[in-house]
């Protein structure tokens, strides 16, 4: 059977897609990149916010067009959208031949068999259960890969549906994480990107204490060059974790700490732990302890209780803290969440206007950061040659894949993807940096 996978949404979802691909490969199925010509197209969806839901529906409809044209036989939809809208998908999208929830990725092979036998699989398992340990088919370039260390979330932010889609927080056993990490390192992965919905909480459910620092020290013993950290909850930083990040050379001084907002009233209404003073203290502590630190965060504008004063406070906070990278999203009420029932709403157009203003603030901060790098030499991991820019493209410690842009550079000889090279920064191009090989 020829199977094509389409993965939407976050890197955590991508890991699930890669696991399903490995299960299909091991069962003897043929994996193909393009949907056209496949027996089955598997679409692993995101259903977190409105834009993600729209992308998922558009992707399903595009696959349905291929099916109508006889280029695809069956469509199987998995992931967060199906977990959230099981009945609606079955009823309103008759083109979909089967669905699976977020607790059922391990059932992909029997689901495909049921599908091709004429059935309409509808497989949903316990989303709070133990994490299945499966091999993966890496879809990222061979020099970097994601390492997911936990599933689910216990933070219960008032605006977020993730706990209802992914279940309670479950850490993977450290020995399982390290076994997978060794396989990645042995396969030639140079940059290991540690992810979960909240990696700072790692270990508390299994071992009764936070274990991220201990895990990082073990990962540093493996043959990775870089270890990058994503999704750290701000009030769970221990001194041990900060010291480990500062002292371990392989752990990059790049931290993705989603804060969403800084106003105390908004944070409390959204069931976010901590307050503005604690955020300021944390960022000062991190900057003082970790040289060259680059911060990334996520921000939401237009949350309930965000009046004009709270929004101005957020703008001033960002100008004070100077967070180098940020993803900015206008709030969209998600059915089934406490925030969706709150009365202190901000108009959708106003939320979008505020998001645009925050993007402007962050653009100026990023420009200042880029200006500070001019003339300096930085280590760059080459991602390959970009035929459009006619330059090599890569990333320094300050750029995470897909979300932070790249550094484009010239060289008088071939630079291989996965090679680390020194690059002198000489300019900027549409917010991204340009440079030249500094050998």
What are these regions (language model features)?
Residues 157, 177, 194, 229, ...:
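Conserved, mostly hydrophobic/aromatic
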Residues 1-202, 240, 255, 277-288, ...:
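Proteins enriched for Cys/Gly/acidic motifs involved in redox and nucleic-acid/cofactor modification
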Residues 91-106, 213-224, 247-254, 313-325, ...:
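Structural recognition of alpha->loop->beta junctions
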Residues 6, 195-197, 230-232, 258-260, ...:
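Generic beta-strand/beta-sheet core signal
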Residues 75-79, 84, 186-309, 319:
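Conserved SAM/AdoMet-binding glycine-rich loop
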Residues 47-48, 166-167, 206-209, 268-274, ...:
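Short glycine-enriched, charge-decorated loop/helix-capping segments at active-site entrances
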Residues 341-439:
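Terminal RNA-binding accessory module
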């Amino acid at each position: 059977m020829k199977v094509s996978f389409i993965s939407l949404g976050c890197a955590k979802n991508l890991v699930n897609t890669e696991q399903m691909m490995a299960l299909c490969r091991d069962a003897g199925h043929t994996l193909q990149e393009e949907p056209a010509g496949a027996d089955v197209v598997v679409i692993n969806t995101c259903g977190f916010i409105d834009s993600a839901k729209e992308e998922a529906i558009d992707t399903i409809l595009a696959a349905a067009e291929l099916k109508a044209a006889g280029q695809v036989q069956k469509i199987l939809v998995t992931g967060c959208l199906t977990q959230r809208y099981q009945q609606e998908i079955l009823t309103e999208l008759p083109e979909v031949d089967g669905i699976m929830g977020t607790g059922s990725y391990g059932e992909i092979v029997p689901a495909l068999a049921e599908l091709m036998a004429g059935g309409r699989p509808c497989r949903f398992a316990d989303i709070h259960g133990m994490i299945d340990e499966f091999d993966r088919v890496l879809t990222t370039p061979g020099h970097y890969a994601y390492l997911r260390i936990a599933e689910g979330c216990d933070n219960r932010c008032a605006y977020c549906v993730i706990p209802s889609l992914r279940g309670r927080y479950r850490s993977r056993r450290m020995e399982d994480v390290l076994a997978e990490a060794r396989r990645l390192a042995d396969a030639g992965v140079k940059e290991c990107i540690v992810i979960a919905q909240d990696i700072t909480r790692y270990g508390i459910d299994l071992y009764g204490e936070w274990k991220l620092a201990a895990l990082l020290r073990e990962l540093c013993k493996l043959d990775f060059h870089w270890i990058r950290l994503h999704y750290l909850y701000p009030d769970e930083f221990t001194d041990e974790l900060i010291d480990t990040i500062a002292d371990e050379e392989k752990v990059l001084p790049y931290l993705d700490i989603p804060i969403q907002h800084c106003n105390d009233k908004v944070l409390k209404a959204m069931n976010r732990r901590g307050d503005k003073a604690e955020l300021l203290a944390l960022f000062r502590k991190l900057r003082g302890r970790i040289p060259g630190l680059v911060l990334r965060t996520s921000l939401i504008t237009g949350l309930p209780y965000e009046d004009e004063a709270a929004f101005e406070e957020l703008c001033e906070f960002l100008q004070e803290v100077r967070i180098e990278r940020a993803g900015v999203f206008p709030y969209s009420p998600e059915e089934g969440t406490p925030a969706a029932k709150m009365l202190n709403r901000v108009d959708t157009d106003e939320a979008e206007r505020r998001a645009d203003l925050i993007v402007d603030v962050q653009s100026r901060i990023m420009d200042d950061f880029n200006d500070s790098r001019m003339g300096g030499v930085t280590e760059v991991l080459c991602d390959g040659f970009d035929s459009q820019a006619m330059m090599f493209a890569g990333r320094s410690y300050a750029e995470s894949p897909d979300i932070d842009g790249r550094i484009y550079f010239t060289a008088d000889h071939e630079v291989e993807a996965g090679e680390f090279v020194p690059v002198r920064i000489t300019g900027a191009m549409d917010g991204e940096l340009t440079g030249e090989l500094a050998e």
